[in-house]
């Protein structure tokens, strides 16, 4: 009740005391009405007092945070004549620049768009530039081409970051990372304005740590466009799908509709060797396992953007993902046991998001996700001593997540700014599994559990921008978190400094803190059998881990990136295998360690040869230290150096045909325990 009163009071406060701060916008074009990117727009008062500056985006648009009664705009670009514009309205309109006449005889100057731009401490990438020479078909694939970003087994990582979060349009969502990945895989690249990479997310994003913010394009003209695409891949099985989308836009309204259907079939082989000691005897267990999965996934999204007026906007979006009749099969054959496991699943996800943006710097939004999962599985096992066991299991999960937030920004004099906001998130989880038809010597336990999770947070931020491009920001977020009988107050500081010696030399330093909570299913006292030897156990009382991250980055010529990083994670938890001491069983279980610490460096070097070859070399070197005093009966404290090298190559073999080849090498590293 106390949290609700605080939130209500804060909403009233920000809605009543927010002064009328606005923005001045416009668009820069050439004489052929083509947008001009990279033009510098300087705003002054009529008495020449400096107010602020901006750089035009890829579509020629610019935004200045100031809104004086009258002003003077100075527009400059290396290839165009400087122009002065006087204005009194918040819409500066379309400003046309005339090209300079250099009179260079038989000389062709080809410009290269910068790979990265720094805006308010954020590393901004134009995905259309990155995907010009890359074989990408959707927004998710374009994100994997960002410098320092790698994908492994469906998980994205950023070089030098402990973890990575993806957000859309700078706002949180109650969708999981897997559900958000599905959304981006069904989003065309041409719907994305840019991707912003931050090693220390500002508090108004309501996430912490490293973040990639995917900014969708806005349309303010009369247009209709659509796209149909198909994809095919073969990894033992043939898989593929089809996607369709269209956008209808007017100056007041934009409607986006997308639908995709994918036939997903995968195959994976694993080999296991376990030297298991039991009752002073050593058993050498070998096992080969074949894992296959087949399913159809249907994805739909409908988004509506309504421009109430020039300064006020309302966005509503619905996202659905449905995977009925999924079938997973595991067949294991080894020296200790033979087993087969069939699992049939039915998963559904529905999400709705609402966001209101006002001209006074206030944003209010909410998000709701409903997720249901049902599964039925059957397992048969025969041990080497001819003993047999079997069971059938019915299980499921029901999750409801709600979130609301409000953010307020104020632009002060001399390019100072402040921000503050609140957020509240509530989640309700219900898990169950019931064993039936149990035969043989197998331990089973029916479980049914309910969890309620609440998170309330508030923050205050301060930032400063200089005309040279240098900027800094600091913030502190207070959070109250509760789940079950666990209650915790925490404060998360954040700081970021960007120094521009010149556009060719950019330095950035960031500090962030975060807390990572275990999944709901991981905290249940359940046992799930993977085969006749391996099993998965829950961990009631699993503690969240706290992350501290320090990153330093140097960007040379807006394309070459060099970084140093340090991360320390207290109460680190990971799912690790453990050989049971009372029976022949390999137990996979999440446990808390003392800490996990990493220190290292990364280098990103893009290069090209003519118009036919484009490449990027990524090098990462780091030392990891892992310590755990209470890992069952085998405590450990170990260090290990690791080096990773990745070379991404794109060959232009035709006007509309490209070939990609990626090479990766990694030195041995610690896996599990």
Regions found by a protein language model. Give the residues of each.
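Short, acidic, small-residue-rich periplasmic hinge/interaction motif at the N-terminus
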Residues: 42-44, 76-80, 92-131, 151-153, ...
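A short, solvent-exposed loop/turn motif at the edges and junctions
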Residues: 44-49, 72-86
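Short, acidic Ser/Thr/Gly-rich low-complexity loop/linker segments typical of extracellular
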Residues: 47-61
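N-terminal periplasmic accessory domains that precede
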Residues: 93-96, 139-142, 180-182, 196-197, ...
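Extracytoplasmic beta-strand/coil segments of soluble accessory domains associated
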Residues: 140-175
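Short acidic/polar hinge/loop motifs at secondary-structure boundaries
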Residues: 173-200, 244
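Face-selective signature of the C-terminal outer-membrane beta-barrel domain
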Residues: 253, 297-323, 341-493, 498-504, ...
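Outer-membrane beta-barrel signature, preferentially recognizing the C-terminal barrel domain
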Residues: 397, 515-564, 568-570, 586-600, ...
């Amino acid at each position: 009740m106390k949290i609700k009163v605080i939130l209500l009071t804060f909403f009233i406060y920000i809605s009543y005391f927010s002064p009328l701060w606005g923005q001045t916008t416009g668009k820069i074009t050439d004489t052929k009405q083509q947008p001009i990117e990279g033009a510098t727009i300087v705003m002054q008062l009529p008495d020449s007092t400096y107010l602020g500056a901006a750089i035009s985006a890829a579509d020629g648009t610019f935004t200045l945070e100031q809104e004086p009664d009258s002003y003077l705009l100075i527009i400059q670009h290396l290839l165009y004549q400087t122009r002065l514009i006087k204005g009194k309205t918040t819409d500066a309109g379309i400003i046309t620049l005339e090209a300079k006449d250099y009179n260079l005889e038989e000389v062709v100057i080809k410009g290269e768009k910068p790979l990265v731009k720094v805006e308010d401490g954020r590393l901004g990438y134009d995905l259309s530039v990155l995907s010009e020479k890359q074989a990408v078909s959707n927004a998710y694939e374009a994100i994997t081409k960002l410098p320092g970003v790698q994908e492994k087994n469906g998980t994205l990582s950023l070089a030098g970051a402990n973890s990575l979060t993806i957000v859309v349009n700078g706002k949180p969502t109650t969708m999981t990372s897997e559900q958000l990945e599905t959304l981006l895989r069904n989003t065309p690249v041409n719907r994305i304005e840019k991707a912003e990479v931050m090693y220390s997310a500002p508090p108004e994003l309501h996430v912490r740590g490293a973040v990639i913010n995917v900014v969708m394009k806005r349309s303010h003209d009369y247009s209709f466009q659509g796209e149909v695409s198909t994809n095919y891949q073969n990894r033992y099985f043939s898989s593929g799908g089809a996607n369709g989308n269209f956008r209808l836009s007017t100056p007041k309204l934009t409607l986006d509709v997308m639908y995709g259907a994918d036939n997903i079939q995968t195959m994976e082989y694993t080999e296991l060797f376990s030297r298991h000691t039991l009752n002073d005897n050593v058993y050498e267990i070998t096992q080969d396992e074949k894992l296959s999965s087949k399913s159809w996934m249907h994805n739909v999204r409908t988004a509506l953007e309504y421009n109430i007026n020039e300064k006020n906007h309302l966005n509503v979006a619905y996202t659905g993902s449905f995977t009925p009749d999924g079938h997973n099969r595991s067949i294991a054959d080894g020296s200790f046991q033979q087993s087969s496991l069939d699992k049939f699943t039915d998963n559904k996800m529905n999400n709705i998001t609402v966001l209101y943006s006002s001209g006074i710097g206030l944003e209010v939004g909410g998000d709701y996700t409903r997720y249901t999962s049902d599964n039925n599985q059957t397992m048969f096992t025969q041990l080497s001593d001819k003993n047999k066991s079997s069971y059938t299991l019915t299980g499921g999960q029901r999750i409801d997540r709600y979130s609301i937030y409000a953010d307020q920004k104020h632009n002060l004099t001399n390019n100072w700014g402040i921000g503050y906001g609140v957020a509240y998130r509530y989640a309700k989880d219900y898990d169950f599994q019931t064993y039936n038809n149990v035969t043989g010597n197998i331990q089973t336990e029916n479980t049914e559990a309910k969890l309620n999770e609440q998170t309330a947070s508030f923050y205050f931020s301060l930032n400063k921008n200089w005309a040279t491009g240098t900027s800094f920001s600091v913030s502190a977020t207070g959070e109250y978190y509760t789940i079950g009988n666990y209650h915790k107050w925490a404060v998360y500081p954040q700081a970021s400094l960007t120094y521009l010696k010149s556009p060719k030399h950019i330095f950035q330093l960031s500090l962030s803190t975060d807390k990572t909570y275990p999944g709901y299913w991981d905290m249940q006292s359940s046992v799930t059998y993977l085969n006749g030897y391996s099993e998965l156990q829950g961990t009631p009382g699993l503690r969240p881990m706290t992350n501290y991250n320090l990153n330093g980055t140097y960007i040379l010529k807006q394309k070459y990136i060099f970084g140093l990083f340090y991360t320390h994670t207290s109460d680190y938890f990971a799912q690790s295998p453990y050989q049971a001491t009372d029976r022949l069983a390999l137990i996979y279980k999440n446990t808390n360690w003392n800490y996990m610490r990493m220190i290292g460096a990364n280098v990103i070097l893009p290069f090209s040869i003519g118009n036919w070859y484009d490449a990027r070399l990524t090098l990462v070197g780091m030392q990891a230290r892992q310590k755990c005093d209470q890992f069952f009966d085998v405590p450990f404290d170990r260090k290990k150096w690791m080096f990773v090298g990745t070379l991404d190559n794109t060959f232009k073999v035709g006007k509309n045909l490209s070939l990609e080849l990626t090479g990766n090498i990694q030195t041995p590293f610690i896996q599990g325990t």
